[in-house]
Structure formats: C-alpha cells, structure tokens
C-alpha cells in the first residue's frame, strides 16, 4: 500500500481507505515537497529499493549506506576465556541463537531454528540461547541447551558472540541486522534466511550460509555446512574482513561525507 498512497493499513488493522496511515502519508508528501534536494538513505539495498517503490520517494535520489560498527569493540576474543566466563564447555561446537524474546517472538524464527536443530546429525554440539532466561518448559533437543540472560552492555556482548562457532539469525523479517554485523565482526560465521538486507552482509559460503527458502531443512544444512567446513579459519577471517571493508565506522563516515558534499553541490 505504501507504493500508492496508503489506507486500509494492515499494521493498524484498518479497513478504512481514509485511515490514519493515509493522512500521515499525505502530510509527509506535502512536507517533503518543500525540500527539493531531499536525499533518502536506505541502510540496506533492500530498504533502498523499497524506498524507491514508495509514493513518497519514487522521484527522489536514493542511496544505500549501511549502519556502522565499532570494530575495536566487536572483535575476535579467545574462545576458551569467554566460554569459561559463561560456563560453556570448551570442547564443544557452539550454536548461538539470540534475540529479544527469542523463544516467543515468531518473527525471530525460533520455530524454524528449533525444527532445524532436531534435523542435525552432528557430534559434540551444544545450543546457546541468548536474550532469554530459561523457560519453565524447554524444547526436547538431542543436544544440551544453555541460556544466557539479556545482555545490554558493550563489553559482555562481544564476549557472548565469541563463545560461538556459528551464529544463527533465522528472523523472518529483517532490514540490516545488528546481530549479523556484530557476529561477523567477531569472526563468527552466520547462517540466516536470504531476506531483507542479509545478503548485504553474508556472502553465501564465504562468511556464512544464506538459506534461499524459509526452510528448517535448509537452515539445518547451513548449520552443518559451517560446522563441518574444512577451512573454518578462512570463514572466520573473511567474516571479519567483510565488516572491516564495508561496515567500519570510518568507512561509513567517509561515505556520508561524500553524500553531504554531493547534496550541497547540487543546491
């Protein structure tokens, strides 16, 4: 609906043509018309395309500049040290899944992940669920499950990522996932569905695995591929390299400076 003029907004559960969404988009259209040099930034290629399809921005300049990351904060840390801190076994391969309300928010793909875990045929594996306290009822997995309560500080987050051998981000809706960028910056390959801006960060079978279908079976295939890959160090190194090249705060800041210059030169 945003491609035309809104109304009957599904987010508002509205069935009226002249609802709040229609009034808001009309007001925005009137306001934006007063700024002829308005430039739109989509933080993912997918979002930039969506912006170009909208009635508000179809005739505007649209660029893609991603969110940035402090690569000095999110970086590889010795796994043995951080696993000891979180009481995770040193001698196991760790699958990490984390999100706010990861076991109850359907959009986070918990159902798809748990189904995929049951399909795995791997040895010496544990599952770590971050961002959630242990629920009263725990899924019956063939692998041990550890829970890490929500972490909010910038010191413990990178440490948590570094306990993992692979991080799963099975969200069914994403723009440009902070979790994916942060994981890759720590040198941890990521498995996710090929939706939203995920392909901006994950290069299939170079620093992770992109499942082309919303499929638990393919997600399981991706997890197995990462954990059994014969050159894991290469995956890990390229994960970090990708972030340094495209998402480092210095790199992104330079792109914004160039954009501001272009906008000012065009006025």
Each PLM stretch: what is its role?
Residues 17-62, 69-73, 79:
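A short, active-site helix/loop in glycosyltransferases that binds the activated sugar's phosphate group
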Residues 89-108, 114-117:
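Conserved donor-binding/catalytic core segment of Leloir-type glycosyltransferases
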Residues 124, 131-159, 163:
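Nucleotide-activated donor-binding/catalytic signature segment of Leloir-type glycosyltransferases, i.e.
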Residues 158, 177, 181-185, 199-200, ...:
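Short alpha-helical segment that forms part of, or immediately flanks, the ligand-binding pocket
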Residues 172:
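Aromatic "clamp/platform" in nucleotide-sugar-dependent glycosyltransferases that forms part
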Residues 189-192, 202:
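Short hydrophobic beta-strand element within catalytic cores of glycosyltransferases
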Residues 204-205, 209-216, 225-230:
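Conserved acidic donor-binding segment of nucleotide-sugar-dependent glycosyltransferases
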Residues 231-246, 255-258:
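A short, well-ordered alpha-helix in the C-terminal region of glycosyltransferases
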């Amino acid at each position: 609906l945003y491609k035309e003029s809104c109304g009957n907004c599904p987010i508002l559960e509205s069935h009226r043509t002249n609802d709040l969404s229609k009034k808001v988009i009309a007001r925005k259209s009137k306001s934006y018309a007063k700024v002829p040099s308005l430039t739109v930034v989509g933080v993912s290629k997918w979002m930039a395309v969506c912006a170009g399809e909208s009635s508000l921005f179809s005739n505007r300049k649209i660029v893609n500049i991603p969110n940035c990351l402090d690569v000095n904060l999110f970086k590889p840390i010795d796994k043995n040290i951080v696993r000891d801190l979180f009481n995770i076994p040193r001698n196991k391969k760790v699958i990490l899944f984390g999100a706010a309300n990861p076991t109850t928010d359907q959009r986070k793909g918990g159902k798809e992940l748990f189904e995929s875990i049951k399909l795995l045929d791997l040895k010496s594996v544990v599952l770590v669920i971050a961002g959630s306290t242990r629920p009263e009822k725990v899924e019956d997995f063939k692998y041990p499950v550890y829970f890490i309560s929500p972490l909010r500080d910038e010191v413990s987050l990178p440490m948590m990522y570094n306990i993992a051998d692979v991080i799963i981000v099975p969200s069914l809706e994403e723009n440009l996932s902070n979790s994916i960028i942060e994981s890759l910056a720590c040198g941890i390959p990521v498995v996710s569905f090929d939706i939203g801006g995920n392909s901006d960060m994950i290069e299939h079978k170079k620093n992770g695995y992109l499942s082309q279908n919303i499929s638990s079976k393919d997600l399981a295939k991706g997890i197995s591929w990462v954990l059994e890959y014969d050159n894991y160090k290469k995956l890990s190194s390229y994960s970090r390299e990708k972030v340094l090249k495209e998402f480092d705060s210095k790199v992104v800041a330079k792109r914004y400076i160039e954009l501001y210059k272009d906008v000012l030169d065009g006025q």
